Amino acid sequence: MALTPTREDKFSFGLWTIGYTGADPFGGPTRSDLDVVEGVERISELGAYGLTFHDDDLFAFGSTDAERQTQIDRLKGALSDTGIVVPMVTTNLFSAPVFKDGGFTSNDRAVRRFAIRKVLRNIDLAAELGAKTFVMWGGREGAEYDSAKDVRGALERYREAVNLLGDYVTDKGYDIRFAIEPKPNEPRGDILLPTLGHALAFIETLERPELVGVNPEVGHEQMAGLNFTAGIMQALYQGKLFHIDLNGQRGIKYDQDLVFGHGDLQNAFSLVDLLENGGVGGGRSYDGPRHFDYKPSRTEDITGVWDSAAANMRMYLLLKERAQAFRADPEVQEALAAAKVAEIDTPTLNEGESYDDILADRSSYEDFAADEYFDAKGFGFVRLNQLALEHLMGARS
């Protein structure tokens, strides 16, 4: 398999990722700001297909209309010259001091109204650029102190805002869906909708739930100690995987934003296997952008920035290659059958069977030989996982 990225791979990068200057809570920038035109040109040369951005990545918070339009025009020119697309746009409701207690859920009602206006304006820009997804990461929606935030009221204000946005895109006729990005903490001590499961439950309370899905990020779910691949399976099961953020994370700690695959490599392997081979008939289960939300390490210069961008795509393609070999291995197929992996898709009840029928079925309980599972009838899961790891390590062809 070719390891050179192409537009068909649908790799995309956030402008805030390749444009990260290295500043962190303990030190200032180690690199200069990246111009948006250079960013578009370089990711195009590397084989990406898309660029995403927050409004404040493209033009500074508080920019005049003229300054804003200048940057939009420059971006449009670069997109036209390179063929790069904008599949997703988002709004920064976390950096400016006005959002220190959040945007949609700030205790200050005037701030909430300002946040909605900021988002509505950026939705218009997303539609203008042809973006199909609008991501909402509520990085400041939360609290450090239990007494400081009425969570019930905050969730109602969150719901009110998202319902309004759904009305807006519907009335405007925009072909845009929303994707909530969960995160357990950082920058707030506790963030509302901290995990994929919380977000999925919240979506079901909305007036237009069909317009809202999730944008899970590898590191965010792993910060909560969760299995990212399992979470993606549930999002796919519920038809809510509208976008995905790929990066690397090594355990329960701060949000590292490493290159994809440079953290939990085994989980990255199972994720790529799911995305590429987990659909009906073994095809793709998700056909949207493979979006890299990472930070080039603070230690790197501009050469290292582009090396790290290329590394994300190469890691994904390497894992895709390993996953395809894993699926094609006859020994793996035998191990999958022995583990009865496919049997989970067989309904537990027979067609038309009720609880009366299963209660009357002696083979399901009275005559079922449960004792035969002691010292026998192992599932062979360890063998299957060993085969997966050997393929991941390139030990099997």
Curated annotation (Swiss-Prot):
Q: Name one cellular component (GO) term.
A: cytoplasm
Question: Do you know which PROSITE patterns this protein is assigned to?
Answer: XYLOSE_ISOMERASE (PS51415)
Pfam families xrefs: AP_endonuc_2
Q: Which reaction does it catalyse?
A: alpha-D-xylose = alpha-D-xylulofuranose
* UniProt cross-references to InterPro entries, sorted A to Z: Xyl_isomerase-like_sf, Xyl_isomerase-like_TIM-brl, XylA_actinobac, Xylose_isomerase
Q: Keywords in UniProt for this one? A: Carbohydrate metabolism, Cytoplasm, Isomerase, Magnesium, Metal-binding, Xylose metabolism
Q: Where is the signal peptide?
A: none
Where is the protein found, in the record's own terms?
A: Cytoplasm
Q: Which GO terms describe its biological process?
A: D-xylose metabolic process
Which residues bind Mg(2+) 2 per the record? 217, 220, 255, 257
Q: Which residues bind Mg(2+) 1?
A: 181, 217, 245, 293
Cofactor binding note of this UniProt entry? Binds 2 magnesium ions per subunit.
Answer yes or no on keyword Isomerase: yes
State the Gene Ontology terms under molecular function.
magnesium ion binding; xylose isomerase activity
- Known partners and oligomeric status: Homotetramer.
Q: What is this protein called?
A: Xylose isomerase
| Species this protein is from | Clavibacter sepedonicus (Clavibacter michiganensis subsp. sepedonicus)
What gene makes this protein?
xylA
